Amino acid sequence: MREREYATFLFAIYSGYAFKMTQLTVARQVMAHRGRRLEYFTIVWNGLEGLIAVAAGIVAGSISLVGFGMDSFIEVTSGATLLWRMSVDADVESRERNEKLSLKIVGACFVALAVYIAYESVSDLIRKRSPEHSIPGIVLACVSLIVMPILSRAKKKVGNALGSAAMKADARQTDFCVYLSTILLAGLLLKAVLGWWWADPIAALIMVPIIAKEGIDGIKTRTCC
């Protein structure tokens, strides 16, 4: 009788543990699916944003708008990388391998972005170039300031739930898109209202070391999940 009770007790414990593990697995799959949807949205949004910004920049002769568009294309690369990572979340070994590679790719995107912004900012200062008046550029920057913070918070939530350093790094990159949108908007408005041609390149240069540090940290990171 005691053996039967003991066996029943062990079975109950095992069943409860198995049920709990199943719940955790299902919850993780749900968050991974949410992460994939966020990355799909990131790719589509930034692709359109990049095309509009580059087109508006060429029409207005604005280097800042063109640079902003290039940043959006880098965000597309980051989003595609994280989408790849999310697609193998159920496979532990593949997840770990892709996590490391994702961190390095996202880090490389940060570094590339920092180099590009530094180059364009210095060029603007030397040549005394400034953003031209662009209504599409101002509208685009305003919309980006609404969408990007919401997207960043959603990515951070998924990154924390999955323990994904790559997703958190991508969320930080989305934050930088918010900063760049602010800089773009401020540059366009200050030039249009006050004629301060140097405001945009100086503000962009302030961001360069921060972006570069994030990129280097991402490339050097060894731990994941």
Residue ranges of each PLM-predicted region?
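Alpha-helical transmembrane cores and adjacent cytosolic helix/loop segments
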Residues: 14-225
